[in-house]
Amino acid sequence: MNLYLFTFKFLYLLAGVLVNNFPRLSLGLYNRAIDVYLKKGLNFDFIEILLDIAINLDILGMKDQAVQSYKKAIEINPNEARAYYGLAIIYDDNREFSKAIEFYQKAIELDPYYSKAYFFMANAFDENGQKQEAAQYYEKAAELDPTHFWAFNNLAAVYEETGQYDKALAAIRKGLELEPEHFKALFNAGVIMNRLGYPRKAVEYYRQSLERNPRYSYTYLNLSLIHLEEKDYQKAVEVISKGIKYVPEASFLYYNRACFYVHLDMYDLAVKDLIIASDMSRELEEYMWNDRELDPLRDLKLYKEHFKATVS
């Protein structure tokens, strides 16, 4: 093998190995490989180099340079679907969803079997509040890759949000077939079961979810709200208190426990939790002013002292 070609390939392959753990070193090796490539006129696919460098630049947070590298690849080959996909990912990360969707669509026009592009385009539609389009493309991603757990999981969540509970149940069952132990799928199954009017099944799924991940705060919230609906306020407090133990930074858990304490006439404890929640979250503090559930607290001395001071 030509010595220069060997050197180029060594640098190029080593850069690829190091890209995730040592992206800056990897980028330096790619640049050295390009230097050899350009000086010696080696026969190698330059687009592959540009795409790899763009990925490196993106990992390093050098978004503008990554965009230029992807665009250079497109100049060389306007039909390079991966370059459009890479651009879409960058705009997606910047929450420029409309622009990201435009590039995802271009990628799948060029490669109709690009399952990752369908999935992330669905996610961009989802984040942008376009639930119908999100469902359409999650379905396509799942069709192209029937082992794509997140396509089924996210599809179930979208169907649940749009009130299509039977479709949501079918999707989450497929997700659980792929990953029966995944806490998020078990959580979503709990949400869907409760929506369908099966609170006991929902409780079962939520408990399984907590066994897999005791630090997912929304599971405690949803489980406690089922007990609230059943007027088992003590059990609701017990569940949400456990959530606070595992996720003490979740302000909404304190807020909801305050509401549960109100139902138990434990007003002093309710005010203390409300103070913690409002200190942690300006949004919750603003919300509480119009929350009628908290009206029994408003004449209490501790409530007046703290929240009058907050207002003034």
Model-identified regions with their sequence ranges:
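Helix-start (N-cap) detector for alpha-helical repeat units in TPR-like alpha-solenoids
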Residues: F8, I47-E48, A81-R82, S115-K116, ...
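Canonical tetratricopeptide repeat
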Residues: L13, D52, G86, F120, ...
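Register position in tetratricopeptide repeats
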Residues: N20, I59, D93-N94, E127-N128, ...
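Canonical positions in the second alpha-helix
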Residues: A33, A73, K106-A107, K140-A141, ...
